[in-house]
Amino acid sequence: DPQQRKTVMDLVKDVCPERIYPVGRLDRNTTGVLLLTNDGDLASKLTHPKFLKKKVYHVHLDKNLTSHDMDQIREGITLDDGEIKADAIEYADDRDKSQVGIEIHSGKNRIVRRIFESLGYRVTKLDRVQFAGLTKKNLRRGDWRFLTEKEVDMLRMGAFE
C-alpha cells in the first residue's frame, strides 16, 4: 500500500513459506471472502470471467432500491467499460429495501459500487459473502482459515460455481 496502511497481506505474512497472493480483490471499504493462494493456475481459473465463478455480495445503500432500478440491474446497465447485469439480485430483507443481495461473476474493479452509483445510489456497506462457493461462515472480520483438502480439490476441478 503506497500510504503504508495495513493490508490483508499483513495478516498472513508469516503463515507459510510460499509466496501467496490474493485471488481477485476487495477494496479498502469492502469486507468479506478473499481467497489467497500460491497456485497461479487456480487463481487464473477463479478470476477469469469465462469461468463464471460467482461472487455474492450483501449491499447496504443510502436509500431504498426501487423495483424499477432492480429490474434495470437484472436486465443490464451500461457503464463506462461496457454493459453489466447481475446474475441475480433480491432484497436482503423485504422490510428494508436499502439492503440487497447481488450475485455477479464479473471481476471488474469496483463493479458492485459502480452499478449502484450509476443509478444514483451510494453504497454505505459492502460485504462479499460468497466467492466460488466459499463463504465466511464462522469467521469474524480479520480472521482467516486454511481451505480443507476437499475445498481445494473442488476449486481445482471447477466444481464450485
Give residue spans per PLM region.
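Basic, flexible Lys/Arg- and Gly-enriched helix-loop patches that mediate nucleic-acid binding at interfaces
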Residues: 1-161
